[in-house]
């Protein structure tokens, strides 16, 4: 299950392993489209990949620090370092390809 995180918990939740953060908002149509795709990927990948999401309206500090201007923005970190940023909706196959580069 994809976990909701906040500005306060971001560093702790994304500092180890392979982590994909979904920056989203409740009013964002493409964000609602990517949510079930991320749930499916999380279910398939299990412990190999952690997926978290952050509501940009409730938590403006973290997205601002990463220059998030459009949502959804998917930020992939490996052992605390940003390795990839994906902006906008992408189909599952494309997300799997990107994730596979870092597993």
Curated annotation (Swiss-Prot):
Protein name: Thioredoxin
Family that this chain belongs to: Belongs to the thioredoxin family.
UniProt signal peptide: none
Disulfide bonds: 28-31
Keyword Aminoacyl-tRNA synthetase: no
Encoding gene, per UniProt annotation: trxA
Biological process annotations from GO: cell redox homeostasis
Cross-referenced InterPro entries: Thioredoxin, Thioredoxin-like_sf, Thioredoxin_CS, Thioredoxin_domain
Keyword Ribonucleoprotein: no
